[in-house]
């Protein structure tokens, strides 16, 4: 199994990827480091594929990973509902490749390569 350690323990890495995946689903675009974005890409693609399946088992698998955060305060929609109701149907005809990574230059302070990862 190939993955990046990202300088964290496995629990910290899983928590960080859960947070980033939830934020990406809610905001549809986030700014992060290049290595985090590349690792996040595979996680989010799997979540969107679960959303496209749309059955109860897929919903429960996604719920086990996605954080329970409010995506839209007006409607009370949470991140999981947004994934299954808004994001996944958008990619019904697309077989993978749901995200785009665009480089934006180094971060001030430590010169880490920064990118914007967004849903296509």
Curated annotation (Swiss-Prot):
Query: Which keywords are on file for this protein?
Result: Ribonucleoprotein, Ribosomal protein
One Gene Ontology BP term is:
translation
Molecular function (GO) terms for this protein are: structural constituent of ribosome
Give GO cellular component annotations, separated by semicolons: cytosolic large ribosomal subunit
The record, for SUPFAM superfamilies, names:
Prokaryotic ribosomal protein L17 (SSF64263)
NCBIfam families tied to this protein: L17 (TIGR00059)
Family affiliation:
Belongs to the bacterial ribosomal protein bL17 family.
Q: How does it assemble?
A: Part of the 50S ribosomal subunit. Contacts protein L32.
Q: What is this protein called?
A: Large ribosomal subunit protein bL17
Q: Where is the organism placed in the taxonomic lineage, from the top?
A: Bacteria, Bacillati, Bacillota, Bacilli, Bacillales
